[in-house]
Swiss-Prot record:
One of its GO terms (biological process) is translation. This is Small ribosomal subunit protein uS12m. SUPFAM superfamilies: Nucleic acid-binding proteins. The lineage of its organism: Eukaryota, Viridiplantae, Streptophyta, Embryophyta, Marchantiophyta. The gene is RPS12. Protein S12 is involved in the translation initiation step. Its main location: mitochondrion. It comes from Marchantia polymorpha.
Length: 126
């Protein structure tokens, strides 16, 4: 336990918080190239085959990004835009691919939550 005099001279050093999206280098999004597209099963109470992509970003970092929505057209060497945001039931997946940007197409025929899945407004929409 330090004395009051020691605290006045030195002070307490605050803990450093680690950033959750370190690979993005403080950018909101980063572009990258898919190295591998595969599926992964989630943690204990859930059951599915979640679609993921291993991506090499423009700053040469390699990350694992989640591909949201039903169906996708990604394959090796596809160019994608990546944003931060983890997937709660996939350990180590801390990034999302952005739908409707670069080579990753939006979901056709989607009517609700379109902005999250890169879908244009349909003509007959009221």
């Amino acid at each position: 336990m330090p004395t009051m005099n020691q605290l006045v001279r030195k002070g307490r050093e605050s803990k450093r918080r680690t950033k959750r999206t370190r690979a993005l280098n403080k950018c909101p999004q980063k572009q990258g190239v898919c190295l591998r597209v595969s599926t992964r099963s989630p943690k204990k109470p859930n059951s599915a085959l979640r679609k993921i992509a291993k991506v090499r970003l423009t700053n040469r970092n390699e990350i694992i990004a989640y591909i949201p929505g039903e169906g996708h057209n990604l394959q090796e060497h596809s160019v994608v835009m990546v944003r931060g945001g983890r997937v709660q039931d996939l350990p180590g997946v801390k990034y999302h691919c952005i739908r409707g940007v670069k080579d990753l197409q939006g979901i056709p025929g989607r009517r609700r939550g379109r902005s999250k899945y890169g879908t244009k407004k349909p003509k007959d929409y009221i």
